[in-house]
């Protein structure tokens, strides 16, 4: 059997656990091989570290960010003869799932595009390890993934309106245990820093000693539980008490239709985030739509 791993680095983000043992020890079975995404341990991504943001899952480690799909292929019964070239054709199959998160931002007041920092997106409940032989997910430990929106993912759609589309490549996401939870697996968190000119009592902009405008800065954040949407997407399958990865060639699109509203008069110094506005906790299912 010949195996190919598609990503390699001195400290690989993607690795196959027990691969060396399998190659050199006949007692090790293919059922002992696990594909895993490296976690960051006690560290946090640079986009999160140092930012005083609400942490809905402080005990969960972050996975290293996967910026492209994960492909895997196996060739069995290969006959390689010494001194002769051997050409192998691999039928690479995508085994990761691509989840697209779509949400909108609306600003009110004197907030310009340059006043908005790139949003930070976090998704919890990510699986980091699964068995290659039977695609059974290891859910004994779940992780979270973080991504900062890139310029091509953040577009202005109108006066004071913006649209974000971000992508996560994952081995599977476990939904929340209940719709009303805002911690644990399956929680989507959005945070972005907003600046707005500071005004004096007469409404005139405040400037510093050098004549530069003084701005107030604040993190706006919100969390939402797309329980029904993750369940409907069928990212996982439960059989005989085990959880299996469900392969899908199609992306899963989770769209939050209720915009995150940012009001200039609420950007004040030394304050906490205003949360997801508007938000109706009695009707959480009305906030998100899904396209598979």
Pin down the residues of each PLM region:
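Short, low-hydrophobicity acidic/polar segments
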Residues: 3-95
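Tryptophan-paired
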Residues: 3-19, 111-236
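Generic marker of residues within folded, mature protein domains
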Residues: 80, 91, 111, 180-182, ...
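Solvent-exposed, conformationally flexible loop/turn segments
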Residues: 81-85, 157-159, 233, 257
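Intrinsic-disorder/low-complexity loop/linker signature
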Residues: 83, 160, 200-204, 208-212, ...
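Intrinsic-disorder/low-complexity, polar/charged segments enriched in Ser/Thr/Lys/Arg/Asp/Glu/Gln
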Residues: 85-87, 98-100, 161-163
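A short, Gly/Thr-enriched small/hydrophobic beta-strand-prone motif that recurs across taxa
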Residues: 92-107
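Extended, compositionally biased alpha-helical segments that mediate assembly or anchoring
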Residues: 215, 221, 226-292
């Amino acid at each position: 059997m010949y195996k190919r791993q598609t990503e390699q680095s001195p400290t690989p983000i993607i690795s196959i656990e027990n691969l060396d043992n399998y190659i050199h020890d006949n007692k090790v079975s293919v059922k002992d091989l696990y594909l895993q995404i490296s976690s960051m341990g006690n560290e946090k991504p640079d986009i999160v570290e140092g930012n005083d943001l609400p942490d809905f899952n402080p005990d969960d480690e972050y996975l290293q960010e996967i910026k492209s799909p994960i492909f895997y292929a196996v060739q069995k019964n290969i006959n390689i003869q010494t001194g002769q070239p051997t050409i192998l054709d691999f039928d690479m199959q995508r085994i990761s799932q691509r989840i697209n998160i779509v949400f909108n931002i609306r600003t009110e007041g004197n907030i310009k595009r340059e006043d908005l920092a790139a949003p930070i997106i976090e998704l919890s409940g990510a699986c980091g390890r699964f068995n290659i032989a039977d695609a059974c997910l290891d859910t004994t430990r779940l992780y979270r993934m973080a991504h900062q929106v890139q310029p091509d993912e953040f577009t202005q759609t109108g006066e004071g309106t913006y649209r974000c589309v971000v992508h996560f490549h994952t081995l599977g996401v476990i939904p929340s245990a209940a719709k009303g939870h805002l911690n644990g697996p399956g929680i989507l968190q959005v945070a972005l820093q907003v600046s707005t000119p500071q005004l004096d009592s007469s409404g005139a902009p405040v400037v510093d000693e050098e004549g530069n405008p003084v701005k107030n800065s604040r993190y706006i954040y919100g969390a939402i539980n797309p329980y029904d949407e993750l369940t409907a997407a069928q990212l996982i399958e439960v059989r005989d008490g085990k959880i299996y990865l469900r392969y899908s060639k199609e992306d899963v699109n989770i769209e939050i239709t209720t915009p995150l509203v940012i009001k200039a008069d609420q950007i004040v110094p030394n304050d906490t985030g205003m949360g997801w506005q508007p938000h109706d906790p009695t009707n959480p299912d009305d906030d998100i739509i899904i396209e598979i």
